[in-house]
A protein has these predicted regions:
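Canonical Radical SAM [4Fe-4S] cluster-binding loop centered on the CxxxCxxC motif
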Residues: 6, 27-63
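Short, well-ordered turn and helix-capping elements at secondary-structure junctions
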Residues: 22-25, 53, 86-88, 115, ...
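Glycine-rich phosphate-binding "P-loop"
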Residues: 54-60, 81-88
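Non-heme iron-sulfur electron-transfer modules
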Residues: 11-17, 56-70
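Auxiliary Fe-S-binding modules of radical SAM enzymes
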Residues: 1-27, 31, 177-244
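Conserved AdoMet/S-adenosylmethionine-binding subsite of the radical SAM
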Residues: 69-81, 90-217
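Flexible, glycine- and charge-enriched loops at secondary-structure boundaries
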Residues: 58-62, 148-152, 218, 222-225
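Short beta-strand segments
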Residues: 40, 85, 134
Length: 244
């Protein structure tokens, strides 16, 4: 069951649990220069996660939101947008109010989410200018990747919410040969196309930050192969392959 919606009035932005900030990124929001705010906490345990240090939601926030906001105020006219990433940002009930404060500074708002909390995602989508949705696997393989039951259903609900919202988006999947067979990848792409997804990316597993030694040892830079990439590419209006 997805988490209940908790209003921003009850959770002011100062309560946002920030795990870190990247001052400048040209890759986290397509076509924009952005700062990235990393929010603590994620209930899923994907083996290929490159931010495992953010999975635990602690009582202490390494950075106060007031510090982050002051930093962003100094970046006005230097960057275009602020992306909330994680962890899973929608886990934090203070996210909506933090987004409003970012908008008030004149920045665009981006969001990276795995769609773990469909109702919370739906709450913040009206505040989002662009959202990147991490789709983990085809439905039968989903729980094996996330380490959590019922994860495919939650992801599907979130995908439907994003498509219904009208927000600019990208769906993307990080692939590893030990987790995703070519058949799985193609089946997932076909499912997304049938849902109405038009913008999709495949991202090759990155060893940087990953805590799973087995996945690091069995990764290969040439997976997926060119034939599969061509099949997937043809299903979408825009398609991106990220090998780095």
């Amino acid at each position: 069951m997805s988490a209940p919606i908790l209003t921003s009035a009850a959770f002011p932005a100062k309560q946002l649990k920030v795990g870190g900030v990247t001052a400048f990124s040209a890759t986290d929001y397509p076509g924009k220069f952005a700062a990235v705010v990393f929010v603590q906490g994620c209930p899923w345990h994907c083996g290929y996660c490159h931010n495992p240090h953010l999975q635990k939601r602690t009582g202490h926030s390494p950075l106060a939101w007031s510090q982050v906001l002051a930093h962003l105020q100094r970046r006005v006219a230097l960057i275009d947008a602020v992306v909330f990433s994680g962890g899973e940002p929608t886990m934090d009930p203070a996210l909506a109010e933090a987004m409003r404060q970012v908008h008030a500074l004149g920045f665009g708002v981006g969001l990276h989410s795995a769609g773990i909390y469909p109702r919370r995602l739906a709450e913040v989508l009206p505040l989002v200018d662009w959202v990147g949705i991490d789709v983990k696997a085809s439905s039968p393989a989903y729980d094996g990747v996330t380490g959590s039951s019922d994860s495919a259903r939650l992801a599907l609900e979130s995908a439907e919410a994003v498509l219904a919202s009208g927000a600019a988006y990208e769906f993307r999947t990080t692939v590893h040969p030990a987790l995703h067979t070519p058949e799985d990848i193609l089946a997932l792409a076909q499912t997304l196309r049938a849902l109405g997804v038009r913008h999709y990316a495949l991202q090759v597993f990155r060893a940087t930050g990953c805590a799973d030694e087995g996945l690091k040892a069995t990764s290969t830079a040439d997976y997926p192969g060119a034939e599969l990439v061509a099949q997937v590419s043809g299903l979408f209006k825009t398609f991106t392959l990220r090998r780095e």
